[in-house]
Amino acid sequence: VTKAGFGVLLNLHYSDFWADPGKQFKPKAWESYGVKELEQAVYDFTLEMMHLYLENGVNITMVQVGNELSNGLLWPEGKVPNYDNIAAFVNAGIRAVRKADEERLAGSIKGVCPQMEGLSKIPVMIHLDNGGNNALYREWFDNFTKRGEDFELIGLSYYPFWHGTLDMLTNNMNDIAERYGKELIIAEVSMGYTMEDYKDYEKLTDE
């Protein structure tokens, strides 16, 4: 991807498997950790991944701390409504990104992609699902911004068969852009030819 001239969005899930609003399970290696240990583990892992990708010349143009965090991360400690813990974990990831970026700009990381020379700051995105649900975004980001580190972008998932109409998405984006003063990105989207849930078609035969 880097050789082709594209930037890379580094998406950190903080789980042994894909994480989304229905499953935000801690890695097995972290299962016995308390809140402070989880916070440190997020920081250490994020910094390690930043070093790994930067040292191997990957053109990181954005970092996503967690995936679809609508219901939190690192359950059960970081499950909504435990916003103090959610903020602690997300903040740890953001701080690690900032630390690695400081090292990149200082020239202390070798092998950094030349395409990143003009990038003054690697932006951080926080990503929720259900892009048409304004109440969700207000509740989540109202709570996080009282406790959280600074970040640059809000990411939204939008699947119309789950997340409402385009008008609902537009209204939500207009509201949160003004309310939080962040850039927005639709991080996941699928516009199918039907509004029916595809789960109805997953089992086509009895065999």
What is the predicted role of each segment?
Residues 12-18, 66-68, 190-191:
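Short glycine-enriched loops at secondary-structure junctions
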Residues 1-3, 7:
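N-terminal carbohydrate-binding/catalytic regions of secreted carbohydrate-active enzymes
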Residues 130-133, 159-163, 190-194:
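Short, catalytically relevant binding-site loops at active-site mouths
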Residues 3, 119, 179-181:
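Short, well-ordered coil/turn elements that cap or connect secondary structure elements
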Residues 20-145, 149-151, 164-175, 202-204:
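Active-site cleft segment of glycoside hydrolase catalytic domains centered on the general acid/base Glu
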Residues 170-207:
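Surface-exposed substrate-engagement region within the catalytic domains
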Residues 102, 146-150, 156-159, 178-185:
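Short helix-capping and hinge/turn segments at secondary-structure transitions, especially at repeat
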Residues 8-12, 61-65, 124-126, 152-156, ...:
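Hydrophobic faces of well-ordered beta-strands that scaffold small-molecule active sites
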